[in-house]
Design a protein with these regions (language model features):
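Catalytic loop of short-chain dehydrogenase/reductase
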Residues: 134-136, 163-235, 247-248
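Rossmann-fold cofactor-recognition segment
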Residues: 90-108
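C-terminal helical subdomain
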Residues: 152, 207, 211-215, 220-223, ...
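Canonical Rossmann dinucleotide-binding motif of NAD(H)/NADP(H)-dependent dehydrogenases/reductases
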Residues: 48-74
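Conserved NAD(P)H cofactor-binding loop of Rossmann-fold oxidoreductase domains
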Residues: 127-134
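Short C-terminal tail/terminal secondary-structure segment
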Residues: 299-321
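Conserved glycine-rich Rossmann-like NAD(P)H-binding loop of the short-chain dehydrogenase/reductase
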Residues: 71-85
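Short, flexible catalytic-loop segment of classical short-chain dehydrogenase/reductase
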Residues: 245-255
Length: 321
């Protein structure tokens, strides 16, 4: 049984296509960026510290609110309308925000986002909360977006992250349900060059059985990748960690709870130690710790926060019979 993924809302088109076109007018006070071009702004951007938020859902939003005061937020999403809506909320709360479109499964698109971010100032924080879930996509698409896409984000932003910068990648409790991999498989997921990652034998269609399996191995791969990238990021004086949330009440989670695996998800909640699902704000609190000065000794780590569901899966009422 998988945990509810943390990416929110289905993409408006299949990842891998070109960057989205610029849409209608943006909210007042918000700059829109696409293909690294600023097309609308209310004034010169003077902020020098930039927080990049990839994925306009409520989890990325919750972390951003806690770490972005006095900084410039670059909010990127596959869907421009999602980015605009989230940016308006942040702007209304007093944050300075730009928006951009990004397809994390495209190196060209991720690189363009990096160029946009560095043109705004020093990238001091990255929040990667984009992805697709087992109910949204095929195994191949999940691997391309959730596994390869995360590797691209870590690689590209690892080249420019500022000293004392930090990154949080949203993984999932699902990665903790996958049986143990071999040391060789762990190393392959952690260190294979991004553009060779999807050619690994363990990721071929005859090995990845279904969308749930693809999601679990992608999320396990995220935490392994972050551990390896922490070495490289550390040489720049920066940190990177993953958070593996369980069932967090987001729009996507509510879709999952009413979907074909909904009964299983509800049982997870019922038998967990916490006896409830989580909130984006709770994930935001952990994200703020990891990205802030109090988390300065934490890097290359994965934080499982699922109310005890994984504990119940391995050692409690959810344990496989």
């Amino acid at each position: 049984m998988s945990g509810v993924p943390c990416a929110e809302g289905p993409p408006s088109r299949v990842p891998g296509s070109n960057l989205a076109e610029v849409g209608p007018a943006v909210p007042l006070g918000v700059a829109r960026l696409a293909n690294s071009e600023m097309t609308t702004t209310t004034g010169e951007i003077t902020m020098t510290n930039v927080i990049v938020v990839i994925g306009a859902g409520s989890i990325g939003h919750a972390i951003a609110r806690r770490v972005s005061a006095g900084k410039h937020v670059l909010l990127a999403d596959l869907n421009q309308q999602n980015a605009d809506a989230a940016a308006k909320v942040l702007n209304d709360a007093g944050f300075e925000v730009s928006t951009a479109t990004v397809d994390v499964s495209s190196r060209e698109s991720v690189h363009a986002l990096v160029q946009t971010a560095t043109a705004l100032g020093d990238v001091t924080g990255v929040i990667h909360a984009a992805g697709v879930s087992p109910t949204q996509a095929s195994p191949a698409t999940i691997l391309k977006v959730d596994l390869y896409g995360t590797a691209l984000v870590l690689e590209e932003f690892g080249n420019v992250i500022a000293r004392s910068g930090s990154c949080v990648v949203i993984a999932s409790q699902s990665g903790h349900r996958l049986p143990a991999l071999t040391a060789e498989q762990n190393a392959a997921l952690a260190t294979t060059p991004a553009d060779e990652l999807l050619t690994l034998p363990m990721l071929q269609p005859d090995q990845v059985r279904d969308s749930l399996h693809a999601y679990q191995i992608s999320k396990r791969g995220n935490s392994l990748r972050v551990m390896a990238e922490a070495v490289r990021w550390g040489k720049r004086g920066a940190r990177v960690n993953t958070i593996s949330p369980g069932i967090i009440f987001t729009p996507l989670a509510r879709d999952e709870l009413s979907g074909p695996r909904g009964e299983g998800y509800r049982r997870m909640i019922d038998v967990s130690a916490a006896g409830r699902g989580g909130t984006p704000d709770e994930v935001g609190t952990v994200g703020a710790l990891l990205m802030g000065p109090d988390g300065g000794f934490i890097t290359g780590s994965d934080f499982l926060m699922d109310g005890g569901v994984t504990a119940a899966y391995w050692y409690g009422e959810l344990a496989p019979k």
